[in-house]
Amino acid sequence: DDILIIGVVMNNKGSVLILLVIVIALVIVLGLSVLNSAVNYYAIKKFNTDSKESFYMAETGLNEAYVMTCDLINESIEESLQMADDYLLVNPHSQAEAENIFVVNYMIHIRANIGDRIKTGENPFIEIRNEDLIFVDDILSVMLKASYMHENNVSKVTGAEFVISVPGYNEVSSGTYDVRNYIKLQNWNS
């Protein structure tokens, strides 16, 4: 019944209890490690979900900026066309000058209002990255940055370039124009 180990006499009756305690401890450690892995997996999955949501919300901000820019282009066309038509009522033989008035007023109206129309101070946050908004060869390039901060402090940033062109006076004066022809999206990035 008794076992002699290194000069110490042991009784077999307590060894089963010690073995049972060791097995239970190993099962608990294994269970805790599986639980820890599951919690970490959930945290990573939640972060990925929040990250994707933040990215899509930032893209939504750019889409909203696109719609606001289309509205601004349409408004600029209408106001500039009205100014050119008013000029033609007074000077009916100055078609070239009316076209020039249309183009100049269109560019002025776009440059004066695009910052207020696009920039937002809310989530998603939209900002214009280039400081100088100048038409070059009847093209205005507007660099936009959109960021979204998720409630779990997950932030994503994306950007795009809006290229706004000046429409032809004859095309818009006939009333058959599509605003989307005067804005292009380029350099979409994340």
Name what the model sees in each region.
Residues 5-6, 44, 63:
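A generic signature of intrinsically disordered, low-complexity regions enriched in glycine/proline
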Residues 15-18, 49-53, 63-190:
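Conserved functional hotspots that engage anionic ligands or polymers and/or phospholipid headgroups
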Residues 12, 16-57:
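Aliphatic-rich helix starts adjacent to a transmembrane/signal segment
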